[in-house]
Regions:
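N-terminal alpha-helical interaction modules that lie
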Residues: 1-76, 110-111
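Short acidic, glycine/proline-enriched loop segments that cap or flank alpha-helices
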Residues: 69-74, 89-98, 117
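Glycine-rich, aromatic-bearing surface loops/beta-hairpins
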Residues: 110, 115-118
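Elongated alpha-helical scaffolds
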Residues: 74-84
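Residue at a conserved register position within TPR or TPR-like alpha-solenoid repeats
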Residues: 24, 82-85, 89, 109
Length: 118
């Protein structure tokens, strides 16, 4: 029961954070949205989005893994944040940065699916 409550709280926090990011986007406050994404990344994995883009996929997955088990909630959070980041870059007219964010997000989602099947 406690674990279910915790999962629901985490899901609500993620939804609230994504709503704040979307709100910044709607106001065209892209820097505010990107700053919020960086803040949540630091809370989740201890580093900002720039570092996530600079490291290898294997290193990122290692950061999202504890005792050999992928933290699915944290991985899903990172995938959602990177997708939102890609949306912002796309709105700013930066397709290369958007593509990179989308690609990392997609790879994280695929990793969740592949590990779930295994």
């Amino acid at each position: 029961m406690l674990q279910n409550d915790y999962i629901l709280r985490v899901a609500e926090d993620v939804d609230q954070t994504l709503a704040q990011i979307i709100s910044h986007q709607d106001m065209r406050d892209y820097q505010g949205a990107l700053s919020l994404i960086d803040e949540v990344c630091r809370q989740a994995v201890g580093t900002d989005s720039d570092f996530i883009h600079a490291i290898s996929e294997e290193t990122l997955l290692a950061m999202l893994t504890l005792l050999g088990v992928l933290d699915v909630q944290k991985t899903l959070l990172m995938a959602k944040l990177l997708k939102a980041e890609g949306d912002i870059y796309e709105e700013q007219g930066n397709p290369d940065a958007a593509y990179e964010s989308y690609l990392i997000s997609l790879n994280l989602l695929l990793e969740i699916v592949l590990r779930d099947e295994g």
